């Protein structure tokens, strides 16, 4: 289905059938995008394992869209490069430099 493979924004919910855990992971990852995903289940432990296998920058379990300013925001694949918010965002705005000084040199 086209809605499952394109990155659309809006209030939209796409619901799809799947046969097992491997099938749902395969379908979730079968796109060039990977901004976010949401998993809903009574089995939070299973959701946590599945979340690690989904190629998305953010995965919500039993919620969707809630976040905290200290948690990095960003996607995988064509859904963005880098992260906003949190300590990871500082790397995007920082250029690291190393300066070496020989304090024992007689000049």
Language-model segment annotations:
Residues 1-107:
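Conserved C-terminal structural/oligomerization subdomain of aldehyde/semialdehyde dehydrogenase
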């Amino acid at each position: 289905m086209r809605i499952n493979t394109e990155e659309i924004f809006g209030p939209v919910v796409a619901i799809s059938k799947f046969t097992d855990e491997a099938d749902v992971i395969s379908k979730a990852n079968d796109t060039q995008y990977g901004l976010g995903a949401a998993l809903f289940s009574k089995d939070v432990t299973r959701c946590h394992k599945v979340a690690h296998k989904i190629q998305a920058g953010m995965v919500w379990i039993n919620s969707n869209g809630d976040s905290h300013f200290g948690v990095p925001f960003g996607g995988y694949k064509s859904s963005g490069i880098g992260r906003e918010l949190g300590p990871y965002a500082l790397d995007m705005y920082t250029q690291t430099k190393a300066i070496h000084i020989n304090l024992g040199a007689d000049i």
